[in-house]
Amino acid sequence: GKNKAIYQNETVGNAGWAILNGTGDTLTVVFDVPTTHVYANSGHLGPHHGNQANTWHGIGGTIDPGTTFTAHSGGCVECHMGPESGHSFNAVEGNCQVTGCHSSSKQDYMDGVFDRMQVIGAALDAAHAIHLDDPTGDYAYGNVHPLYGSHDRDTFNAMWNFLVILEDRSMGAHNPTYIQALLTEIESLLGI
């Protein structure tokens, strides 16, 4: 009948690629994307949430498998997931059995990640791969979204890795080795 949904591509269903046509017309949209490119078909494109766990284990980016951060074998979890803080990951000093974790050198490292994310974010924005919703915001903590479009694979992979770091929100603290590798990979892919 008239209200019956018609999928132009039955094999993928309503997965973003399909054309849902509830009018009964036979309208068709064809995306002719060369094999050298990837089509971004959602403003929610990117790694699925759980990025802190993925970063922790060194997975999720285009350089899998990464390196599991050795500090995770004890210290961080002891302080951040102790019985007093519940599952909030807010540090409670009473849990802490380790010293020197959040020294000025750690903050300097995180500031460096932040600075690199600004340069990378601006390059991806200029390539129309992402968009920063608030022009007064920043690319590390701002409201950043992927843009619809056909992107060459290097730009797409750079965007994906950028989103892994962005959604982790730790500026590298969850796995410095892996985040450095992702940043270096992104810069190489974008030529910056």
Residue ranges and their predicted role:
Residues 1-192:
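C-type cytochrome heme-c attachment and multiheme electron-transfer modules
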